[in-house]
Amino acid sequence: LRVATTSLAGCFGCHMAILDIDERLLDLLQLVEFDRSPITDIKHCGPCDIGIIEGGLCNAENVHVLREFRANCKILIAIGACAINGGLPAQRNHLSLSTILEEVYHAQHGLVDGFIPNDPELPLPLDKVHPIHEVVKVDYFIPGCPPSGDAIWKVLTDLISGREPELGHGLIHYD
């Protein structure tokens, strides 16, 4: 089985939680081949069986990466609060984008001639932060901020074994 991971708008804590599988990660590496992930440093995802994605959608580049990633994954797992409901980045959703940009680039004390960047190399921010299921089909959700390594291990080993993943209450928590 091929597994790929990627991160959108978030803190990368969910990828750190994957490392919390600890020595079981070595067992996992005997069962799967990692494609795109920080473990392999592969930047583009090829066809894979299981895709794991963390982070919400804050800008146009996030949406592009998500759609491309989903197109290459037979099964997509949303991992963590940011991917599932927007998480901390979605705290900005009660303000308009123009208000946020004005506050950051013009209203801060000490700014001289502040301007809002308008460079084609920068991804366009979205008006609101969105969870990934609003844009693509998600097959499984692993909640938490971050989810526990045990929850990630349980879902992955269930899928690898052909079982439907089931997380008990003891595996779902927010730290």
Task: For the regions a language model picked out, list residue spans one by one.
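Iron-sulfur-associated redox domains of electron-transfer enzymes in respiratory
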Residues: 1-175
